[in-house]
Every structure is written in structure tokens, then in C-alpha cells.
Amino acid sequence: MPNASDQSFPFPILIGDIGGTNARFALLTDAYGEPRQLEPIRTGDFATIEEAMQKSILDKTSVQPRSAILAVAGPIKGDEIPLTNAHWVIRPKDMLASLGLEDVLIINDFEAQALAIAAPADQDVVQIGGGAVRPFNSRVVLGPGTGLGVAGLVYAQHSWIPVPGEGGHVDLGPRTERDFEIWPFLEPIEGRMAGEQILCGRGIMNLYRAVCAANGEAAVLADQAAVTTSALSGADAAAVETVSLFATYLGRVAGDMALIFMARGGVFLAGGISQKILPALMKPEFRAAFEDKAPHSALMRTIPTFAVIHPMAALSGLAAFARTPRDFGVAMEGRRWRR
């Protein structure tokens, strides 16, 4: 199978961001037009992705896509790709056979987020401290969501190259006196505290319950939405502390990723949680934790951080790649199927 990103895809191209709960699609009719957003699909409403695409997209449009470029949350190995947090198993060969497609590429969901930060529009990001972006320097994107997604973006050979990985599973340990009070009450995974155990939707509840337990109080808020809403309104003291600590711990992990990639091109926070708690991220705690990386604090103060506020950032990244794949070093070997 080809692995060169300069090989184009036949238009029209269906691009999709397939998450654990929702699947979002857009149609790109040519290399110059804007992608046409389609109604989001709940993955639980359909038995297979083929059924979802046929009934929700193909049956409702006169445009027949010739290609599909999909970003999925799950390991891409072989001809069957199970989603990490949903029941769908993506079988590209079946998509070619049943949906009239000629070309299918499957990439990691945070590769798509990384593609989106190559050239974000000013209106799609909000800067949270630091200096100016250094053009063509490495970048990092982190996204607390169902889990904690992390990817790098490096520039080499005249191309932006996304670097996916499992950075959300790095260790996250206590540092302050308050951390040491809270940590015994956090739920670990197989005996260790990974970043994803705190820095995601369920992680907010993990942290909230631990804060309440450390205070000797009952955890009265039922879900992540209640915690974040109560924190932003100031209605619940434990929720306020939870979101403040969440911002601190996200700053620590984001700072670690910035050091790993020497991300002078910027560190970007993606996803719905980052957008919702943006007021908390704009407070000093996030940047203070991000910059607290002795002996490199002076360097860290120069690295800009941003919240991505584009509602469909992954789709914008996929669209940029679909238009001009030669501008990106996306590995295709073992991930592209054609007939």
C-alpha cells in the first residue's frame, strides 16, 4: 500500500471524526470549497458505520463521495479497526464494497487534531499566556475528553508531520501538600495514577470525589457537567477546587509535552472540556503549572499556550489534509485501502 502523503484522493471526499459517542462528518467537493458540515451521528444509534453513513449521509445527499478520510479513536491495525469507546468495528474493505467508495484512509483521532493546529485561524484559538509562535517549530495538542489525547506536530522535509502516541497515559504524581491529601482517594488504574485518570471527563469525577473525601464531605454532584457548571458559577466549593486542580494538573502535563517536543510553535488544548472550562484555564494556575519546569522555567515562559475553540477542529484538520496531502507527512502504509 502507498505511504506517500503526496498521493491525492479523488473528490468528492467524505471526512469524518469518529468518537466514542458521536461521529461528525463533512463533504469536500473539491480542493477549493469549504467542507459542508453534516448532521452529527450518535454511534449508538446504528449497528455499523456502513449503516450510519448510508442512512444518515448517502441517502440524504445527491453527492456520491469517491473517497473517505476518517479519524478514529482506536488502534489502527489490520483490516478490522475496533473503536476504543464504542461498539463499531470499522472494516474499510466493507466500506469500499458497500458504499461505492474508491479510496479509504483511516488515521488516529489526535492526528486529525494535530493537522488542525498547523495553521489555525486567529478566530479559532484563544491564547493563554506565553510569547509568540515560532513558525515551523514543533507543536503539541492535548485534548481532555473521553480520555486524554496527545499528539505532536513537527515540521520536516517541507511537510507538517503529525506524531500520534499515548501521551495521555504518562504518570501524574502529587507535588504539593494538598496533592498529598487528595492522592490517597483517587482511583488508580492497575496501581498507578496516569494523566488520563484525572484529565478527562470521568477524571473530573475521580478528582471531585477525591477532593470531597479529603475534606470529609459527601460528594453531592452526580456528573462531570454538574461539577464544571457548579465550579464556574462558584456554587460548590469542592467543584471550584476540582476544576482549579484540573487546570493545574493539565498545565503540568502540557508543560511536560512541551519539553518533550520543544514545542516553541505552541501548545494547544483541544476538545469540549477545554472549551467549557476556558475561564478556569485563563486563571493563573494553568500557566503557573505549565511554566514550573525547573531548570527550564525561563524557556517555558516563552512557549505560547492556546485553547482551540473551533467546534469541529478535527474536521478542519482533515479538510486541510484532503485538499493538499503533499503539505503533510501523514503515514498511509497499512491505513489506506483502495479498489
Curated annotation (Swiss-Prot):
The keyword ATP-binding applies. ATP binds at G16, D17, I18, G19, G20, T21. It catalyses: D-glucose + ATP = D-glucose 6-phosphate + ADP + H(+). GO terms for biological process: glycolytic process. It is an enzyme of class 2 (transferase). Gene3D superfamilies: 3.30.420.40, 3.40.367.20. One of its GO terms (cellular component) is cytosol. InterPro entries: ATPase_NBD (IPR043129), Bacterial_glucokinase (IPR050201), Glucokinase (IPR003836). GO terms for molecular function: ATP binding; D-glucose binding; glucokinase activity. Its EC number is 2.7.1.2. The keyword ATP-binding applies. Keywords: ATP-binding, Cytoplasm, Glycolysis, Kinase, Nucleotide-binding, Transferase. It is found in: Cytoplasm. HAMAP family: Glucokinase. Belongs to the bacterial glucokinase family. This is Glucokinase. It comes from Sinorhizobium medicae (strain WSM419). The gene is glk.
